[in-house]
């Protein structure tokens, strides 16, 4: 019987060669300094940005004095700054004399408007609440720092000898009434 076998030559691809890892190690070593360099550049930029922000903040705080300013004048905690003045709006209520003493103890005084400027701004801010201010009736309405009141004040009783500010303007009140108050401090 004849042998019907078919033979074929099988050509298999050669086994993959193991690549030399040393080439990859060299590239990895070369990339490490680049990463370190990028980190250094990023940290340097961050430092420059932060220093610029500090300089900008100091310039805002000290005005045109820049670094000549030995210490920026700041308002105490819980006080609001407007220009060269700090203002404290109390949350608690006291009579006029206790409010006056509170402000004096903080190196300030009850809010005054000796030149009648700023009344409208504060009227808008205080809204419906009444706040003690540095105004009282002793032989006529006078501000605590001396000048006579040249604005009108609403009063409905002769016993109302202390001034308040309200959304609707200046009002007289009995000095014994417990109200909130506004202290004012001029920055050096």
Curated annotation (Swiss-Prot):
Q: Where in the cell is it found?
A: Cell membrane
Q: Which residues lie on this side of the membrane: Cytoplasmic?
A: 1-34
Of the GO CC terms on this record, one is: plasma membrane
Cite a single GO MF annotation. carbohydrate binding
Membrane topology annotation: Single-pass type II membrane protein
Q: Does the keyword Flavoprotein apply?
A: no
Whose protein is this, by species? Rattus norvegicus
Please list the GO biological process terms of this entry. innate immune response
- Gene transcribed to yield this protein: Klrg1
Give the matching Gene3D superfamilies. Answer: Mannose-Binding Protein A, subunit A
Q: In which tissues is it expressed?
A: Expressed in lung mast cells.
Cell wall biogenesis/degradation in keyword set: no
**Protein name as annotated:** Killer cell lectin-like receptor subfamily G member 1
Which parts of the chain span the membrane according to its record?
A: 35-55
Q: What does this protein do?
A: Plays an inhibitory role on natural killer (NK) cells and T-cell functions upon binding to their non-MHC ligands. May mediate missing self recognition by binding to a highly conserved site on classical cadherins, enabling it to monitor expression of E-cadherin/CDH1, N-cadherin/CDH2 and R-cadherin/CDH4 on target cells.
Keywords (A to Z) from UniProt: Cell membrane, Disulfide bond, Glycoprotein, Immunity, Innate immunity, Lectin, Membrane, Phosphoprotein, Receptor, Signal-anchor, Transmembrane, Transmembrane helix
């Amino acid at each position: 019987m004849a042998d019907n076998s078919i033979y074929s030559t099988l050509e298999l691809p050669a086994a993959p060669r193991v690549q030399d890892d040393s080439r990859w190690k060299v590239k990895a070593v070369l990339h490490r300094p680049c990463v370190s360099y990028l980190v250094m550049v990023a940290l340097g930029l961050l430092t420059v940005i932060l220093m610029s922000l500090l300089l900008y903040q100091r310039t805002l705080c000290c005005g045109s004095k820049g670094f000549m300013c030995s210490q920026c004048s700041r308002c105490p905690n819980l006080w609001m700054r407007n220009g060269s003045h700090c203002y404290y709006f109390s949350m608690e209520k006291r009579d006029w004399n206790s409010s006056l003493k509170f402000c004096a103890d903080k190196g300030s005084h009850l809010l005054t408007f000796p030149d009648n400027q700023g009344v409208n701004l504060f009227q808008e801010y205080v809204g419906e609440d009444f706040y003690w201010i540095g105004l009282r009736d002793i032989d006529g309405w006078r501000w605590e720092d001396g000048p006579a009141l040249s604005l009108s004040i609403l009063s409905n009783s002769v016993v109302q000898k202390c001034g308040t500010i309200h959304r609707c303007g200046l009002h007289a009140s009995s000095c014994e009434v417990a109200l909130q108050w506004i202290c004012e401090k001029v920055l050096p």
